[in-house]
Amino acid sequence: SSRLIWVIDPLDGTTNFSNGLPSFCCSIALVEDGEPVVGAIYMPWPETTEGRIIHARKGGGAWEGGVRLQIAPGNKPVSGRVVVRGGFLPGRFRPNKDLLANGGQQRSIGSTASELAMVADGTYQYTLHGNPHSWDVAAGIILVREAGGTTLSHNKKGWYPLTTFKDNTLGGTQEAITQETLRHWQSPVLSGNPEMVGFVSDNLLPLPLSTRLLRGTKKALKLSRSNRNP
């Protein structure tokens, strides 16, 4: 174990990249005692030859070039403005009528780290990712926080602030976080400004485990049948 660990995803959005789609990025974060304290995300961008680099450090703000970034305002999603709700949503949570009526316009680009960077720059109102790895979100967590936002994760007790990867590992009781701990970390992640995130999390109802297992079994059976009958 070490107090300082680099968490790097050299290519987030691999499927996009391999299919010639320009929605991918490189994500680098420095984690201190489980907490992301420095982060940078590089994204290719159609209007530039250099692409975009969004970066942040703890207490220093989130920046792109010389411009300090600010997260999108608002206490609930606005129709016509984009959000990300991962494809996992029907399998783990059920949005209530308030969220269905005020959910925003769903637009996922297939790169979790890129989407978090665009929460930080105010493009996305919020993002909700189903089961990302630590390397998908480590840089994005510090970018969102330093742009004035917040990030939540979810466990069996409900939503909680995701400030350190210790929060969702071994009950948060271990003395030091390790590379192995980070390698196996996965959890739902909700990001946006504090009021927006509060509205979304309050209106997402977790499905009972029995319902999730039943849906998972049905999905597996359907996949098995399709494989037998191409």
Predicted features by range, described:
Residues 63, 70-92, 96-110:
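Short loop->beta-strand "edge-of-pocket" segments that line small-molecule binding or catalytic clefts
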Residues 61-64, 68-70, 196-199:
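Short helix-loop capping/hinge motifs at secondary-structure junctions, enriched
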Residues 37, 69-71, 159:
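Short, isolated positions in well-ordered beta-strands
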Residues 13-14, 82, 144:
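Conserved S/T- and glycine-rich ATP-binding loop of Class I adenylate-forming
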Residues 100, 114-230:
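Oxyanion/phosphate-interacting regions
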Residues 2-59, 63:
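DPxDG-like acidic metal-binding loop motif
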